[in-house]
């Protein structure tokens, strides 16, 4: 097993990331794009943009409340119960397959990895291995149950095949590279015996290849945009494709041609499912409608229901005579809709009869390739909606949690204000790694204005909220930029002028439990300047996910902050932690303060006949009162300079920048950022105070 990717020092520089979140995250926080159902144990596996795979215990269709009886959400008395989470991915979970006779779950992610999980009923340690062969987003997976092979495809243009039977703890790679593929791969399908696979990459080509020989015997054209989903029937003679061009196409593999096209959807079709007999296809996508069409006549369709958000993933509860369908969308809720509801436009008795199609299905009408502005759904669907009531209530719903979708970093470069999909505003402390205040439903801009201060601290971290949670990233270029005094940082310290470094403190917090860091901290003397600069660090919550990654974001190792002291995690960290981290936490090395050049001139109101322009240089954290003291003593040559306390120097000298009077406690970088506002060197004007 491998817990980390290749830790080679070559390539782009490494970064550190951590996620501020609750200890338990039982609900999805954004889009749900991957679904798998274990019918034997009535378990649903769900994954999406928040990086976490969740397991749910769900009732059989006959045990669920009907749509007529109302929606049942996950909760204490709900038939749907959260079971556990599988947490190792660091980016969007794109796909999942159940394999190994239901004992294994294989998942793919935008973090470039394929991960293997043991999901046996009583196994509490689900993670088995990380397969790190891809170098870009892993877009999709396919499973050949008769051959017990898993296939992965990626934006890196590679396709890999893994042997599930080889060993649960050590998947064997059968095909290293699909030669000749020149573009990212968006979709993938295989026959149950892996006799051949279909895949799509740009240039509107669906291509076939034989995984056993790596031969590519055919190409099929027809779609005018990316193909987002592919399905093959069991004998490999027919295929279905769904595209961003809004069409569903049926292909004859032997003839290598498109033999039927469905145009019911007005916008991109992102996901399709087909029953075991390859008789009916279920489709969903950007227009939010979920439709059912007979495969032998894609010109006919039936509207099943309309979702609240674009549909990312469909999953039939059963392949044989499906009674319900699971739906994941751009929202965090997951729903199961009945396919036998009294409110649904049912097929009636004879599903194969022509009369049932003409009675319960509508026929697609030709449409232009570019729909008229303002049309958000096909006109024929709108008319069908008017004629027949849509099913508007799912039989089950697993409610999601709100996701952070907006944020603002406060001027102190320590706190971040966030707003979520329900307009709740909250305040996070980056140094403490936790949420510190909730403001309820308010406008983010209004709270930001209330919390903003006239202080400038250089940026030292990057914020990302694509997972619906707050992710903080540190890199070598900026992490040590934020020097400030303990007074400005708000720390209770006897020496208010002691300098602290936020980035150094953050590294102490992240590695506090790592043995090399603990040893270095213990050996450093209290008078050590770096020790002083980082001594105010916070102890982070132990459940905080912590990731070492390459410069492009590809993960090298993921762990929890609280596990850094464990033997395995400690050893893996030692292999992948970059030098700029170890220099600080092991050797107590920090960059020096940044210097700032500036000019001193007498204020124009002094009517100086030949004003002298002095060019000076000082740390950017130098306070204006120190400049006042220099002017009073050195420039003006006052003999009583030593008798004027520093906290009273403003009674002798005034300082100006761009005609604005400066406060004595303001530092030079704040003056440059808020008052000077130019790229050139800072100009400061002094004027003696007249008694």
From Swiss-Prot:
Specify the species. Caenorhabditis briggsae
Q: Has keyword Repeat?
A: yes
Similarity comment text for this entry:
Belongs to the WD repeat WDR48 family.
Q: What is this protein called?
A: WD repeat-containing protein 48 homolog
> What is the stated purpose of this protein?
Together with wdr-20, binds to and stimulates the activity of the deubiquitinating enzyme usp-46, leading to deubiquitination and stabilization of the glr-1 glutamate receptor.
* Keywords, alphabetical: Repeat, Ubl conjugation pathway, WD repeat
Chain ranges passing through the membrane = none
- Which SUPFAM superfamilies does its entry note? WD40 repeat-like (SSF50978)
**Database matches in PANTHER family:** WD REPEAT-CONTAINING PROTEIN 48
**One example GO MF annotation:** ubiquitin binding
The residue spans of each WD repeat are: 27-82, 88-130, 133-168, 180-219, 222-261, 264-303, 306-347, 399-438
Q: What is said about its interaction partners and assembly? A: Interacts with usp-46; the interaction increases the catalytic activity of usp-46 in the presence of wdr-20.
Top-level lineage group: Eukaryota
Q: Which GO terms describe its biological process?
A: double-strand break repair via homologous recombination
């Amino acid at each position: 097993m491998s817990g980390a990717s290749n830790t080679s020092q070559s390539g782009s520089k490494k970064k550190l990331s951590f996620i501020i979140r609750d200890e338990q995250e039982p609900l999805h926080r954004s889009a749900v794009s991957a679904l798998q159902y274990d019918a034997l144990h009535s378990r649903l596996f769900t994954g999406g943009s928040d990086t976490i795979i969740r397991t749910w215990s769900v009732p059989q269709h006959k045990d669920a409340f009907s749509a007529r009886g109302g929606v049942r959400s996950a909760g204490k008395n709900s038939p749907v119960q959260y079971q556990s989470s599988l947490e190792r991915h660091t980016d969007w979970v794109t796909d999942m397959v159940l394999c190994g006779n239901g004992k294994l779950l294989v998942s793919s992610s935008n973090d470039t990895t394929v991960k293997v999980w043991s999901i046996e009923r009583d196994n509490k340690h689900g993670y088995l291995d990380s397969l790190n062969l891809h170098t870009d987003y892993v877009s999709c997976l396919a499973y050949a149950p008769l051959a017990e092979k898993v296939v992965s495809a990626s934006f890196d243009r590679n396709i890999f095949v893994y042997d599930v039977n080889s060993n649960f703890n050590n998947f064997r790679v059968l095909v290293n590279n699909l030669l000749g593929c020149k573009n990212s791969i968006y979709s993938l399908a295989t026959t149950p015996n892996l006799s051949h696979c279909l895949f799509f990459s740009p240039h509107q080509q669906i291509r076939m290849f034989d995984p056993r020989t790596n031969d590519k015997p055919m190409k099929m054209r027809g779609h005018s945009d990316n193909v987002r989903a592919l399905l093959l029937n069991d004998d490999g003679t027919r295929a279905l494709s769904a595209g961003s061009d809004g069409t569903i196409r049926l292909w004859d593999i032997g003839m290598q041609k498109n033999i039927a096209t469905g145009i019911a959807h007005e916008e991109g079709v992102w996901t399709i499912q087909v029953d075991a007999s390859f008789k009916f296809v279920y489709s969903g996508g950007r227009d939010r409608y979920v439709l059912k069409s007979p495969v032998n006549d894609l010109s006919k369709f039936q509207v099943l229901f309309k979702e609240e958000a674009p549909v990312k993933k469909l999953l039939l509860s059963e392949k044989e005579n499906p009674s319900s369908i699971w739906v994941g969308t751009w929202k965090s809720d997951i729903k199961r809709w009945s396919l036998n509801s009294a409110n649904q436009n049912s097929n009636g008795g004879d599903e194969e009869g022509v009369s049932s199609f003409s009675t319960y299905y509508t026929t697609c009408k030709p449409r232009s390739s570019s729909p008229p502005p303002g049309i958000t759904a096909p006109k024929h669907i709108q008319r069908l909606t008017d004629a027949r009531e849509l099913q508007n209530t799912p039989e089950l719903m697993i409610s999601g949690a709100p996701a952070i979708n907006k944020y603002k970093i406060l001027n102190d470069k320590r706190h971040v204000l966030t707003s979520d999909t329900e307009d709740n505003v909250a305040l996070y402390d980056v140094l403490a790694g936790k949420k510190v205040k909730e403001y309820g439903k308010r406008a983010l801009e209004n709270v930001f204005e209330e919390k903003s201060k006239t202080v400038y601290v250089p940026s030292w971290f990057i914020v990302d909220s694509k997972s619906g949670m707050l992710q903080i990233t540190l890199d070598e270029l900026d992490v040590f930029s934020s020097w400030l005094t303990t007074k400005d940082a708000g720390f209770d310290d006897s020496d208010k002028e002691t300098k602290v470094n936020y980035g150094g403190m953050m590294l102490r917090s992240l590695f506090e439990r790592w043995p090399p860091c603990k040893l270095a901290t213990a050996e450093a003397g209290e008078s050590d300047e770096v020790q002083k600069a980082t001594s105010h660090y916070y102890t982070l919550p132990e459940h905080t996910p912590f990731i070492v990654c390459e410069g492009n974001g590809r993960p090298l190792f993921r762990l929890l902050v609280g596990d850094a002291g464990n033997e395995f995690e400690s050893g893996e960290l030692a292999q992948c932690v970059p030098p700029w981290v170890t220099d600080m936490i092991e050797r107590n090395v920090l960059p020096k303060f940044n210097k700032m050049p500036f000019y001193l001139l007498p204020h124009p109101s002094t009517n100086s006949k030949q004003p002298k322009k002095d060019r000076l240089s000082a740390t950017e954290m130098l306070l204006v009162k120190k400049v006042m003291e220099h002017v009073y003593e050195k420039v003006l040559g006052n003999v009583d300079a030593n008798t004027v306390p520093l906290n009273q120097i403003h009674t002798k000298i005034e300082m100006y920048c761009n005609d604005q009077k400066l406060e004595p406690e303001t530092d030079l970088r704040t003056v440059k950022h808020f008052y000077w506002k130019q790229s050139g060197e800072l100009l400061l004007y002094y004027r003696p105070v007249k008694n």
